[in-house]
Curated annotation (Swiss-Prot):
Protein name listed in UniProt: 2,3-bisphosphoglycerate-independent phosphoglycerate mutase
A GO CC annotation given for this chain: cytosol
Stated family: Belongs to the BPG-independent phosphoglycerate mutase family.
Binding note for cofactor: Binds 2 manganese ions per subunit.
Keyword Iron-sulfur: no
Encoding gene (name): gpmI
Record has Isomerase as a keyword: yes
Gene3D superfamilies for this protein: Alkaline Phosphatase, subunit A (3.40.720.10), BPG-independent phosphoglycerate mutase, domain B (3.40.1450.10)
GO molecular function per UniProt: manganese ion binding; phosphoglycerate mutase activity
Active site feature: 75
GO biological process per UniProt: glucose catabolic process; glycolytic process
Amino acid sequence: MSKFSSKNINKTKVPESPVVLAILDGWGHREENLDNAIKNANTPIMDSLWHAYPHTLINASGADVGLPNGQMGNSEVGHLTIGSGRIIQQELVRITNVVKNNQLTQVNELKEMANSIKKKKGTLHITGLCSDGGVHSHIDHLLGLIKWASEEHIEKVAIHIITDGRDTPAKSAYKYIRQIEDCIKKFKVGEIASICGRYWIMDRNLIWERTEKAFVNLTDPNGKKIDISPADYLNKSYNANITDEFLEPIRISKDFLKDEDSLICFNFRPDRARQIIKALSEKEFDNFKRKSIPDVDILTFTQYEANLPVKIAFPPESLNNFIGQIVSENGLKQYRTAETEKYPHVTYFFNGGVEVPSPGEQRHLIPSPRVATYDMAPEMSAEELTISCSNAIKTGQYSFVVINFANPDMVGHTGNMAAAIKAIETVDRCIGKIVNATGEMGGSILITADHGNAELMKGPDGEPWTAHTINKVPLIFIEGEKRKIPNMGNEIYLRENAGLADIAPTLLQLLNLPIPKEMTGKSLIKEIELKGFNKVVQHV
């Protein structure tokens, strides 16, 4: 049991006014107007809030979120850092250190898989996102696995490439394929067996027909091998205006998953690897009809979901005393809401990888629109999300509310400037309504983001920029009339040079709850001039 359990803390009565955390996913800060969807959008609400209320810019990338210096942040890492109130060494760093130190041969689950493959004389299949984006995977980990397979004398290795084009430039796959081919040549093991764009195999929105298409490419014994080189396939696709993210699944060797084979998925981020691994591993599966279900041993780099019938190379480290846990153990109710694309982030990731809600934690999912890409519906489900969350706030039941607006990130990923501007303007309208609902209840609200994206829509080469950024993100604090900061005077300020890890301690201070020692972040609140909500209402 946590040291901050309800047994040893004086319980606070449920207040009539909430503390709200609004996360504008992908809303970064960048001064330049050029190629900046946020600066070019009409945002009267956010502009008014920024000028009228205490604000600061906080770090959301690199070492400030447990990633290598210069590595862009992402939604998983951002929500994990916010919810934990500390900087946690991320899986990218953890696994990279093992690979760089040539320690894959010391990983027990990899040892067991190597022995099993050699005993069965089967094929080792390796799949994962092949890029250096560092959000879901890293190509260095694949190259390390090829070297490991050579050292373990595994004879048959089939590599199933997932192309990126979302966390990397849209037409950058050839660079990574060349690295793979060079590594295969150097260590004299492996071949490229198939290619598939991440759009198909890494869906997380329960659009199972995408997953099915990738599944068939990996498993169908009657699947047709296409006589084409990876480079020629890329050129053919680019000429047809199909970029890396959307490459059609193809098989370029005779290797497919079959009985007695083994599979390693080297993605370390769970959310976009779950659906394909479920389809490949679960006996009870009804999301689509599987014509061929190969009996293969599966090893994933990290835990994608509790109780999946797979082995894990790098099991999760035990984490304790996240903000949701502290709120729950003090008898307070909390409300988490997002649309489908970001629902795992305000629940699973925000809670440190815990699937099950804490006592008193209410979750509400708003379905994302079923479109091919979100530039086709830049408003997404923000309006429905806003109505639902506003109603929850006004019930007075919840002490702590977390809402995520997905639009800046999901539409920013499309590289469509006009659509991103619409997405930003939608969120601007919606955040005003959330602020007003909070104000009506006398509550306080923190508005921030988990990482940047929509503030940069083109790269230096003039091509659409579909990845995240390393820019700082805004944070605005509005104190409610019934949610005054305990033991503070009339003037307070927000700290500068802060990071996402400082948000949870700030929220706990607003909730008048103790900050556990595990939270190494520090409250953002110093002396600032307090103002009410009256200046916001007139703009909404």
